[in-house]
């Protein structure tokens, strides 16, 4: 995991509202390496989903760069170049109920990408590819002629995964793909994603708020707070040695299966004033140890190092 697939440099996504400008994503910089899963966590409204949508060009970025294989995602592109980019980068959406067209059969939903990119030369080849994708995600080829309302939430999300895989992408953004599913189904979907990653060499940006599941699937984890990345580290390192107070507060909220311990456990609350900024001082995203980055002051950086 030394070759960079994606480079995000000072990404900003601001929205103008009648009450003022909302800085949903505010000066974000990080890299994603080929073959890895980068988890992105934070509370609702922190900007993690907006980050994913900005990376894949569903939103035009206010400022900053997103480089995919060295090429600027938000730069001007010909239709041919745009099609090439869209084929290499796909998204699995959060809501398996709203993200599938209820008027289309499963075959047409999955094959839509095949049709756009002209990847199937004949109807027979098209249907054969649909059947292969259905079986890849654990469904039957008999499901091809059914409609989304005939499936459970977990099955619909598998259809969404099959749709994303149809064009053989390199990079998939999974925007809270399990949050709308029952707990019993969540592990099945995550295990499926891990298996597909091994088979096809996929790279994931896995966006979620379930910290235990993020640790299970991710190689590295980034923590977002109010549009900013406050900590980024390998998954085990982040859980064993969290440095930013906000990360500590998130981890303290994870319930543990020990009633006696939970009864006496004190949850940590994050207070931004704890950083004690001096006049004119700003928080910076610094590398405190190899691969472990924290948003901190100069004094905190010295203490962490």
From Swiss-Prot:
Keywords, ordered alphabetically: ATP-binding, Cell membrane, Competence, Membrane, Nucleotide-binding, Peptide transport, Protein transport, Sporulation, Translocase, Transport
Knockout-associated phenotype: Inactivation of the gene does not affect the sporulation process but causes a defect in competence. Disruption does not affect resistance to bialaphos.
Subcellular localization: Cell membrane
Reactions catalysed: a [peptide](out) + ATP + H2O = a [peptide](in) + ADP + phosphate + H(+)
Family note: Belongs to the ABC transporter superfamily.
Subunit structure: The complex is composed of two ATP-binding proteins (OppD and OppF), two transmembrane proteins (OppB and OppC) and a solute-binding protein (OppA).
UniProt name for this protein: Oligopeptide transport ATP-binding protein OppF
Organism this protein belongs to: Bacillus subtilis (strain 168)
Taxon lineage: Bacteria, Bacillati, Bacillota, Bacilli, Bacillales
